[in-house]
């Protein structure tokens, strides 16, 4: 969510300041900024993500129910109950265990800011002297030294979207070997993992590079063989799968169980397993990807179930739809959480299934921390190894960037301009940005020369392979714009960018395009065409269904007072969290409360001009403004045609009161008001932009008139 600020540090004595080296994405320069010596602490606290879990009402209720049921059962059997809570966080599960009747509770938390907060929360809830809090990892705990006895009930939340990505296998194995009795019970007791094979041309765009064609459909740039043969990265692509439009994928199988993890058994959980499933396709299609999720049985009897399934496969869909359908679209009736999502795994070589009922084999594998998949017509004769990128594309660019490179409507807007503007054997084009295939396409359109600014090593190597494969003879690469000779600058007819830079997190970080222009503008000829010519930032007040919870205070949870946690996070957020953070808003539904309003306009021919603006947006739909969405519209040329605008925001016109449809291949900026107010009529805003310093600051306030 935040930029990767800390590249190196000068440490200072405690209570003093320190200096951190910060990369400014707009200027492209590193600078030393003074920070409090506890800045790292605040950054870590603000981004720990505990609040999201505490807003997960289903998780909280079902953990509490499982504790009550399990402890009551142990009592009925005449057993004492000694609980170990691994990774206690706020101490919420420890307090639940006490409330459910545990005889003793030992909690461990290795993240010291959280452990210190948990100590205060336990005391505030009357449990300070009843929970033994150990500030260590569970794998460092020794019975007799840290805890008086082995526990016979383990409660923990050690899971992530992949289930095992946070080391659950090793932690459970160690706990059973060193910290738990032979007859210990665990909450959760077991987990089941599911896979569903699907075809999705939309999702496939996040994984492979398509041919770039002109407006008539004739190929301009073909991907080289190394891209076609690359199996991609096996790493999961975690998404809110329920938000993938149903029209965007074709399920080829029903969901199938692929692995079980028994957290309760004394024997070691295997660190590596393989499962080969023979499946039949429900309909014709290409087996391109696997949708993945899991569920957990929190109690030993498997009666208390928590499922992370997308809505179409959720076991409680009918009941949840009956409860929420009036206020929520069907994909949003299932419990929301951002700490456990679903994942897409891309099959290394898509398998064509030409008819319904076609048999094929799905290979499922996991090691201690991750999973991978393959689909083949015949059963593989040997173990399928975890695949890795061999073409530079997947290891250089994010999933969203790969999808953006394939985004046909977006590409056509750029290509329309290039086709109309490039003169064969006359145009000399300077391309600025990372991985700018569209700029490279100007060579295929007949430009006399293309100077391509590409300082990133792997991105450059990828583009060089594309140049070689497509036999482009007039392309020259640059590490720095300062390398350009005066004669080269004087001969330029076009300067082109999308713009896209690898260091960019927020949409306007790509204003680095303007910074590069200022370095050469005094030597440019009159009449040189700059694309895009300008950019506009828009703000839209919205009401999120759920995303605001990642920054919202918790207050109380299942009857326990967690205000001390809220205070800790708020203090840290004020010092370490950007006022605007990046989020892929297509995954997080929100209703528009007004029309978008322009809050900044930047002319790239005069990029150095400073701006200080303020305004007010009238809310035209009733709702709680718990977020402000921001994005950039890039203006390609100065005309009134909507085809001259490439937006990083809504993909369809915004209508107040309706859900916004967002571009799925870029992240937008989001501001979360600290304390959203009821009955607000206006959103007041101000923008302050100092381009030469790379400073772009927003402020927002809610007002009732």
UniProtKB/Swiss-Prot annotation:
Q: Name one Pfam family in it.
A: PrmA
The top EC class is: transferase
UniProt keyword Cell cycle, yes or no: no
Q: Under what name is this protein listed?
A: Protein arginine N-methyltransferase 7
**InterPro entries found in the cross-reference section:** Arg_MeTrfase, MeTrfase_PRMT7, PRMT_dom, SAM-dependent_MTases_sf
Its keywords, alphabetically, are: Methyltransferase, Repeat, S-adenosyl-L-methionine, Transferase
Residue ranges occupied by any SAM-dependent MTase PRMT-type domain in the UniProt entry: 29-372, 381-705
Point out the gene that encodes the protein. Art7
Could you say which protein family the record assigns here?
Belongs to the class I-like SAM-binding methyltransferase superfamily. Protein arginine N-methyltransferase family. PRMT7 subfamily.
SUPFAM superfamilies recorded: S-adenosyl-L-methionine-dependent methyltransferases (SSF53335)
Question: TM segments?
Answer: none
Q: Which GO terms describe its molecular function?
A: histone methyltransferase activity; protein-arginine omega-N symmetric methyltransferase activity
Q: Which organism is it from?
A: Drosophila simulans
Q: What is its EC number?
A: 2.1.1.-
- What this chain does, per the record? Essential arginine methyltransferase that can both catalyze the formation of omega-N monomethylarginine (MMA) and symmetrical dimethylarginine (sDMA). Specifically mediates the symmetrical dimethylation of arginine residues in the small nuclear ribonucleoproteins SmD1 and SmD3.
Task: Give the record's GO biological process terms.
Answer: peptidyl-arginine methylation
Superkingdom, natural source? Eukaryota
Q: Does the keyword Transmembrane apply?
A: no
